[in-house]
Amino acid sequence: MAKKSMIAKAKRKPKFKVRAYTRCSICGRVHSVYRDFGICRICLRKMANEGLLPGVKKASW
């Protein structure tokens, strides 16, 4: 329940712009969110492996 309330709180516009932070649009995770996709690293990897993100491929070197 605490996580849901924090997600709802993050959606509101903060009083000061500095207080705004990124959250994963799928799971609500705060840390390691990629701005380009708007999702966290865990969801990014899961979606990339399933082929749901166009243009993303596994790196090999």
From Swiss-Prot:
UniProt protein name: Small ribosomal subunit protein uS14
Protein purpose: Binds 16S rRNA, required for the assembly of 30S particles and may also be responsible for determining the conformation of the 16S rRNA at the A site.
Cofactors that this protein relies on: Zn(2+)
Gene Ontology, cellular component aspect: cytoplasm; small ribosomal subunit
Cofactor note: Binds 1 zinc ion per subunit.
Any one Gene Ontology BP term: translation
Taxonomic lineage of the native organism: Bacteria, Pseudomonadati, Campylobacterota, Epsilonproteobacteria, Nautiliales
Pfam families: Ribosomal_S14
Domain of life: Bacteria
Gene name of this polypeptide: rpsZ
Complexes and interactors: Part of the 30S ribosomal subunit. Contacts proteins S3 and S10.
Gene Ontology MF terms: rRNA binding; structural constituent of ribosome; zinc ion binding
Keywords from the named record: Metal-binding, Ribonucleoprotein, Ribosomal protein, RNA-binding, rRNA-binding, Zinc
UniProt feature coiled coil, ranges: none
Biological source species: Nautilia profundicola (strain ATCC BAA-1463 / DSM 18972 / AmH)
Family statement: Belongs to the universal ribosomal protein uS14 family. Zinc-binding uS14 subfamily.
HAMAP family assigned to the protein according to its UniProt record, in alphabetical order: Ribosomal_uS14_2_B (MF_01364_B)
Residues binding Zn(2+): C24, C27, C40, C43
